[in-house]
């Protein structure tokens, strides 16, 4: 049965709300219309494309998971997070991150990415850096992508401490490493 445009758009909205990862191709098959019709309907309804919907769901999920700071306080983009276990973030090195004379990334950006990831991985409302032992192992240049991987290596809730090790990579090459001794509240 062919639906009119208004009915189809209402059902389209409901379907995408229920299953945000559905493709335009699947929607076209479900509603018996062309992919172009689905795209036009999405545009009229201001529904983003699949890639954008996936990103929105991921950000919402991370916003709900990260307890110790808000996502806009994280340096880089968190792409994986398991509280009190491990986390991964990506930082694209842009012009604002580098020295203008040589296009080498300023060290505090690499430290900030690693430190904010160490804070974000803590399963507690309060997480602060007590101390850090860090090493920069090679220069990072504008245009490179830094992937920071944090791993919780020790949790002492009764002492209010957690140790997080962070290694940052460009490709397979390590560019930064750090051991962060984190303070957390004792009643988490």
From Swiss-Prot:
Pfam families associated with the record: 4HBT
HAMAP family: Transcrip_fact_FapR
Family under the similarity heading: Belongs to the FapR family.
Highest taxon listed in the record's lineage: Bacteria
GO biological process terms held by the UniProt record: fatty acid biosynthetic process; negative regulation of DNA-templated transcription; negative regulation of fatty acid biosynthetic process
Record organism: Bacillus subtilis (strain 168)
Name of the protein described by the UniProt record: Transcription factor FapR
SS bonds (residue pairs): none
Protein purpose: Transcription factor involved in regulation of membrane lipid biosynthesis by repressing genes involved in fatty acid and phospholipid metabolism. Binds to the 5'-TTAGTANNNNNTANTAA-3' consensus sequence found in the promoter of fabHAF operon (containing fabHA and fabF genes), yhdO and fapR genes and prevents their expression. Its action is probably modulated by malonyl-CoA.
InterPro entries according to UniProt: HotDog_dom_sf, Thioestr_dom, Transcription_factor_FapR, WH-like_DNA-bd_sf
One GO MF term: DNA binding
Keyword terms: DNA-binding, Fatty acid biosynthesis, Fatty acid metabolism, Lipid biosynthesis, Lipid metabolism, Repressor, Transcription, Transcription regulation
